[in-house]
Amino acid sequence: MLTFGGLSRGMMESTLSNALNTLTGHIQIQTLEYRDDPVIENRIENPDLLKTMLNKTLPPGTKWAFRIQISGVASNARNSEGITIVGIDPDREADLSFYGDNVSQGRLLTSGDDHGIFVGQALMDNFETKLGRKLVLITQGADLKTASRAFKIRGTFRAEMEGTEKQYVFITLAAAQKLLGVDTAVTSACIKLPEGKNLNITDLTAMEQTSRELSRELPDGLTALSWGQLLPLLKGYLSMFDSFMLLWYLVVFMAMAFGLVNTMLMAVLERTREFGLLKALGMKPLWIIRNVLTECLILLILGLFAGNLFGFATIRSLAGGIDMSFVAQGSEFFGMGHIVVPFLTVKDVLAINAVILILGLLVCLYPAIKAGRITPVEAMAHI
């Protein structure tokens, strides 16, 4: 149960980390309309004012950057596909997302490289092109007319999911602003808060409280959204995770309970004469029940001790991670990375041990009560 719990927790953490690393961040600042309609018309017109406020408000160690993120089409002589155009500050973006994590070919974008583009390896393969070749981006500009521009491929990246490689293309923020004709405007500010004892990204309540406090400081027309608000499906999955795990522990324990009851019943039946003799000597049924439950408790504690040692040893042996690439399509469906590192929290260990200990004693009540009801006459008749 510890091993399964650790693996499940690792899968959940992998899914969450991958989602936040795919351009979501911990908190995003957008206009009120952008989330429902992510087009360039719903942009932040005066980012300088927002920049000043963020530099004063955010805690030390926070990473943040402006972005332009819109839908568009990538095209060359061989192919064309719908993609998401992401205008970034190359110097800041590497600290916020998967950008720069795994460069497959070429190099990253640099500040001032307004004619370069950084694409996924899968996208470049689909377009049958190579480094140095041009890729045309087509989208709708701020004037509602079609805007297009050619960029040279500077490099390619590998991502945890092939779909990510096909979806996102990166250009500099200045290049995106020029393409769309929006001067200094941006569509969002992505924020990555420093994690520590006062902040845990899996603590949805604390994260949403932080975003609400930030929203109160923002200029009119802007809002701060936590990753839970940006990814409601993932938020729902995580909120059900602990309940799902507890239910799974109960199911596994039900299978274990049959073996435990069988063991205790055999022990009671084999000691029928002993219990009958104790009854004849005046021992009360409640004392016999207490003795049987005490024996059961000792067995459970010994079993938990051995099981915990084995579970911790197994998780420790998998500390380097489990390569899930053999089920790559399945892991991509759930948004997991290719490497899952099992781990347990103190809460997980306590929950598993509590379920086994409490339910184990409840299961042992039947053999204990049966032992308490044995009479001296029944014991004498027992061979």
Which residue stretches match the model-derived regions?
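Hydrophobic, regular-secondary-structure patches
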Residues: 5-84, 107-113, 213-216
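Transmembrane alpha-helical interface segments in multi-pass membrane proteins
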Residues: 265, 272-319, 351, 359
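Short helix-loop junctions at transmembrane helix boundaries
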Residues: 305-351, 365
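C-terminal membrane-exit region of the final transmembrane helix in multipass inner-membrane proteins
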Residues: 344-383
